[in-house]
Amino acid sequence: MASTTAPSRTNSRVNYSNEIHDLSTVQSVSAVPSVYYPEKSFADIFPPNLLKKVISEVVATFLLVFVTCGAASIYGEDMKRISQLGQSVVGGLIVTVMIYATGHISGAHMNPAVTLSFAFFRHFPWIQVPFYWAAQFTGAMCAAFVLRAVLYPIEVLGTTTPTGPHWHALVIEIVVTFNMMFVTCAVATDSRAVGELAGLAVGSAVCITSIFAGPVSGGSMNPARTLAPAVASNVYTGLWIYFLGPVVGTLSGAWVYTYIRFEEAPAAAGGAAPQKLSSFKLRRLQSQSMAADEFDNV
């Protein structure tokens, strides 16, 4: 007479992913898959080049605020030296120069609202946002107080204040910052754009929009650029506008471009996935690599 044996049933405690699970039944024919969550190392959270990026943002934001607020201060004191158009051109040029100078190091954000938008749409790691903000406000504050020393006795150091109703200035700041961020996303986050023209495109956007925004709101588009001279000059009129406006403008500009852009076709089996580029990482190396590959295939 053949005997039958029932499958063995055991109660055990098995550790999966550092968690204890009580298993009422373990079948020998089926294995319970273990789940592994790799822990991020210190180098993943704080990469070795983070300090260099922070210093780059301090320098870039310092020069941005020093030049733009310096030009605005001289314009406010003597309009014959620098015109309103001259201020706009200066602002656009310094943005262009700083993108080419520091874009390959830190991304040349120079703007807390831009950093926030890049992080929100996953073009920049959230863990580095506080460091960038600290660098940007530090550079801006240093520039404002240096201007206070070298331009004495000028008391108003290029502050941005609304010339009319506050809601007029708020709408203007949202629109001009939207334009700046829309262009920025087009040339800095889309791999099909020509990276070498990123600085010229963004600088031109800043120049064009500040020409008509200047007489209404000052054309700040940057909370750090507004806060620093406000503290150095002790002028805080409508300060909230220049925090809310740029944040809304950059987030909406980035969202609209992200929504309307065409998605790249997925890579074929075994092929390389499309490269995701963030901030103002210029693409000279990418184009040189493609040229080298074409040369090798000849």
Curated annotation (Swiss-Prot):
Presence of the UniProt keyword Transport in the record: yes
Keyword annotations from UniProtKB, A to Z: Cell membrane, Membrane, Repeat, Transmembrane, Transmembrane helix, Transport
PROSITE patterns tied to this protein: MIP
CDD domains to which the protein is assigned, alphabetical: MIP (cd00333)
Cellular-component GO terms for this entry: plasma membrane
Statement: the UniProt record of this protein carries the keyword Transmembrane: yes
Motif residue range(s): NPA 2: 222-224
Tissue: Expressed at low levels in roots and leaves. Expressed in roots, leaf sheaths and leaf blades. In roots, it localizes in the plasma membrane of all cells of the young region and is more abundant on the distal side than the proximal side (at protein level). Expressed only in the xylem parenchyma cells adjacent to vessels in both leaf sheaths and leaf blades (at protein level). Is more abundant on the side facing the vessel (at protein level).
Motif, NPA 1: chain positions: 111-113
GO MF annotations in UniProt: channel activity
Expression triggers: Down-regulated by silicon supply in roots and leaf blades.
Residues passing through the membrane, by range: 54-74, 88-108, 127-147, 169-189, 197-217, 240-260
Stored InterPro entries: Aquaporin-like, Aquaporin_transptr, MIP, MIP_CS
UniProt family annotation: Belongs to the MIP/aquaporin (TC 1.A.8) family. NIP (TC 1.A.8.12) subfamily.
Protein's job: Silicon transporter involved in the distribution of silicon in shoots. Is responsible for the transport of silicon from the xylem to the leaf tissues. Silicon is beneficial to plant growth and helps plants to overcome abiotic and biotic stresses by preventing lodging (falling over) and increasing resistance to pests and diseases, as well as other stresses. In the nodes, involved with LSI2 and LSI3 in silicon intervascular transfer, which is required for the preferential distribution of silicon, such as hyperaccumulation of silicon in the husk.
Domain description: Aquaporins contain two tandem repeats each containing three membrane-spanning domains and a pore-forming loop with the signature motif Asn-Pro-Ala (NPA).
PANTHER family, per database record: AQUAPORIN NIP2-1, AQUAPORIN NIP2-2
Protein name (Swiss-Prot/TrEMBL): Aquaporin NIP2-2
